[in-house]
Each structure stands twice: as structure tokens, then as C-alpha cells.
Amino acid sequence: MLTLGEDQIGRIGASSSWSRSKKLRVHRYEIPDLNVEPSLDWDGEETGEATKALSSTCLKPKDADYCLLNVPQLVYELEVEILARVPRFEYWKLKLLNKGFSRLLKSDEIFKVRRERGVVEPSVFMLSSGDTCWTMFDKGFGNCQKLPELPSDICFLHGDKESLCAGTHLIVTGKEEKSIALWRYELETSKWFKGPAMITPRILFASATCGTVVFVAGGLKIEGNGTMEVVDSVEKYDSKTKTWTLLRGMHKRRKFCSGCYLRGKFYVLGGRDENGQNLTCGESYDEKTNTWELIPDILKDMSFSSVQSPPLIAVVGDDLYSLETSANELRVYDANANSWKKLGDVPVRAKSNGGWGVAFKSLGDKLLVIGASAGPSRAETMSVYTSRPSANPANKLYWEESKRCCGVRFNHFILNCCVMIA
């Protein structure tokens, strides 16, 4: 049996007496429900208008004269600055934390700050043969996300389409049963919307992106009675206002042409005229002076065939690159000599279908090429390669294969591909 000495009993009694004389104050804290609707007037979630709301809270005790930690609230401006620096492929996780974050990430405020702070990153939007939904990849092709199905008719779904990006908008145009249609996917809301239509709806045109705007030129206009016309008209889309503006027309009508934005100007290269003749000339548009300058014979060394795709061109830094499909090789343009320098073979089979089914784009400071691998004994699945020209001053490019591709196998024939910087 355990017995206590008198000295131990005394200590216990003293302790008990002390506890009776001192009242222990126990505070209860309310744990906030982060999914409770804020008591603010949110002005139109679907319109993408940013609403200032504090999603962070401070734990406060019921006893008003006491504060345990005095945790400061995270102010709205700081929230935006932090979220703007988070990789975009992590945003879906943040949207699950609470409704405040979800609403903020669905606004355009985050992407506006990303542009202002220079923390934008490229994403690749792609549609391969056999797919009914577009896929978005991060720049390393380690993460991907399926977009919602585009709610168009069956003619649009299975027909030829053009794709371009402006700001956070992915724009896809094509022919529906009765007319040429334009659909846009908004990155903030992850939803498809129809329109706004171009001033002159068209297909098979040239396009180039500059930040939040995109230029389109030339192409094929289809009348209501089915007649087709090659056009020389030019338009600019502003993703901030969701409007099209008519610009000065080109010197020549052209379809199956390609565009790029280089050194502050919109370039349109190649294509076919209204008589179906291949064009070796190009044109550059200076928006400041609203003028077009003809560039004779810029594609004079290019080979043409009856099944030739539009020129495969991409801009990295201040250099213009071309994938010459007939030779399956990469070239860089020398503006002073108006000629192209050969840089070596590309690791995909661009020659097989005259350039169709191959994506050739700029991805930040890298060149990106997607298609069927040119290597022997390769399965007919999509291969992705990148090369950084600045890392090879001797103009000897080295291609690095992205072998992950999210662990998903895609068809090697690429129907549409464009890069969004946001």
C-alpha cells in the first residue's frame, strides 16, 4: 500500500489551496468556417470583376478583454501579390480552400498583377487527332489539364480550325453548319463562351499574339451562299475589352499564310493568293504608323507542294525561325541578307504530311516542336522536344525530349496548338 509522509501531504494541501484561490480562466475560441459566404456584395462572378474581400481571419476569443496571439489579418493586396506568384497549375488547389480564394482566382485581378510583376508563364494548349477536348500543358509538360468540352455543333468539332491566344483567352475559329463561328475559353473561369465574332469572319488566316491582344490577317471568307473569297483585311482582338478593331489591309490577298510578332511589328508570311498561286513575299505591319511594308522573296528558298501547310515559323528573342518541312530542318532568318541560315535537322517527321500535324512554336526562350518522332522504331505517339537557341551561340541546336507528358499517350498528329503567356 502506498503511504504519504506528512511533508508530502503538506505540499499537496498547499497546492490545492493555491488552486482554489486562483481562478483558472479558460477561453473558448471560435474556429471560422472558411466556406461561409462573405457578407459583401460580390459584383458578378461570371463577368470576372475583381472584388476586394479579406479571406483570412483572426481567431478571436469570446472574452473581449483578452487576445491570445493578436494575429494580423492578411490584407487583400498582399493576398493578390502572393497568389500571383504561385504557379498557375496550383490554382485549382487554392480554389478548394475557400470561396474567397475561388472568387479571387476567377477574377482577372490575379493575371493583371502577374503581367505587371513579370511573373507570367507559358502554357501550351493542344488538340490532337482523335481528341474531343483540348488539353493544357505547363511549360515542362509535367502537368496537364483537360479543358471542358467545347459546346459547338458536329461540323465545328470535326472540321478544320484555327487557334490563337490573347491574354488569358484561347480563341478557336472554324466552320459550323451555317457560318464561321468563334469560341473563346477564359482561363479565369475555365469556361467556353461564344464570340465575339470577327468583323470579317474567316478561316485559314495568319495570326500573332502580343500580350493581351492578337492580330489576324488574310484568310478565306465564306459567304452565306457558300462562295469563298480570299481577303486582305486585318483585325486586332483585345482580350481586355473583348472587342475586334479593323486595321489597315495588307498589300496582297492571301490564305494559308502564317504570322508572328517580331521587334514590335506584325509579320505575315507566304500563303496563296486569290488565284491559288504560292506567295514567296511577306509583309510587316507597324501599328504606330498604321502602314504595311512589303518584303519581297522572304520565302524564295522554300519548297512548295500541293499539300503544303502554311509556313511553320516561331520567334524566340529577336530571331525568326522556320521549320522547312521539305528538308525536315530548322532555319533562322537573317534580315540584313533577306536569307535563311540552316541550323540542322529537327527531331520530328515534318516532311511526311507536308508540315500538317506538326506544331512548331516559341515557348518562352525555347523553341517547341511536337509531332511524330523522327527516330527509328518509335511508336506512333506524340513526341515533344524543346531547344534553347541562346544556349548554343555556335548555332548548333540541341533538342531535349520531354519524356513525361503527364504519363498520357497522345496521338502524334497535332490538329491545333498555341501558347498562352499568362
Swiss-Prot record:
- Give the domain of life: Eukaryota
Q: Which GO terms describe its cellular component?
A: nucleus
Q: Which residues cross the membrane?
A: none
Keyword Repeat in record:
yes
Annotated F-box domain ranges read 68-114
Give UniProt keywords alphabetically. Answer: Kelch repeat, Repeat
Spans of the Kelch repeats are 162-212, 213-264, 266-312, 314-361, 366-412
Which PANTHER family does the annotation name?
A: F-BOX DOMAIN-CONTAINING PROTEIN, GALACTOSE OXIDASE/KELCH REPEAT PROTEIN-RELATED
Its protein name is F-box/kelch-repeat protein At3g27150
Q: Which organism encodes this protein?
A: Arabidopsis thaliana (Mouse-ear cress)
Q: Please name the taxonomic classification of the source.
A: Eukaryota, Viridiplantae, Streptophyta, Embryophyta, Tracheophyta
